[in-house]
Amino acid sequence: MAERAQTASAAGTEEETPQPAGTTDNPAEQNSQAENQTDAQQEETKKDFIRWVDFGVSKFAMTEAYEYDRDTYGTDAHISWIDQLAYTAAYTGGSFDSDRTVCQYMDKLREEISQGKTLEKLVKDLEYFSYYQEAYTAVLGGMVGEYEIETADEDGRKSWEKRYGLKAFSPIAKGFPYTDYDDFGVSRSYGYKRNHLGHDMLGQVGTPIVCVESGYIEALGWNQYGGWRIGIRSFDKKRYYYYAHLRQGFPYQPELKEGSVVLAGDVIGYMGHTGYSTTEDVNNIDQTHLHFGMQIIFDESQKDGDNEIWIDCYQIANFLYRNQSEAARNDETKEWRRMYLMKDPAAEAYERTADYSMYP
């Protein structure tokens, strides 16, 4: 269950961040820690924002909710996939282990809406709906919407097509094999003992890595834990996507820099096994893979430090497999680029008002 103001939770850190201070369940120790907080820290504790998210939505549930969202868009029967998931979670306590139960609650909501009832009325007395709606919006909010994408006919002629649907992509380009399993939370020991707060996708050196959601580059370069890595922030600033252990020598596209706007489906880098070294461009990771992480941010105080929220994105990665970006190789530059361009209204809106003065 979520915790809001008055209750601070340490959510762990990404691979590049120092180990956070420990927490305790002992009330006496908690009081002692509170007394030792600075005024600024105590002020942060009083803010009203979500401090913990345990994202357990299954691929099945995301698929069911998304397809109904897409298929009913523009009709009176339309319900966003996030509202369907939040409604279900409010009844199940956030559990999506039973596909049958998921269908039961989603079907119930859809039937009520089709009879003319409003979502507002249906959730009025549903205690935790508002929490799950806010939490799931923070996780999934930029993945579905209106966009334009290039398509090609049988003769290869391209044209633009307006769509509503999934506009987020798998982190791995189409046609490139990879294997994965749910490894979130397993132990890591390089530098310090910690839990693995991402999702490893194992493949071949040079596999094109794709931007999952449109956003802007917030971090780029070498880190001793993540090796060559890219950090991309969503335009609403709720999500931070972390792509690590990129290829030695040629980790990412040469034009990228901090502040660059990237679109979902763009090839941003290449799989490798760099990292675990204070020296740049060193391969100290045994297995070639992409470390893909998702950090959720409700308040900027959660971006770095003891209160970071990293979610298990295994189910999300599997859901996004349905939408892989096709890429083609330029033999002269050895770069891979997406084959079909995209126009994202969210990116266009951001670029109209963005302040780039903070970037070199």
What are these regions (language model features)?
Residues 117-228, 264, 320-360:
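Surface-exposed, glycine-biased beta-strand/turn segments
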Residues 200-202, 209-211, 231, 240-244, ...:
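Structural recognition of the beta-strand scaffold that forms the well-ordered cores
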Residues 212-253, 279-287:
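Zn2+-dependent peptidoglycan hydrolase active-site motif and core
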Residues 260-331:
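Conserved, short, structured surface segments that act as functional micro-motifs
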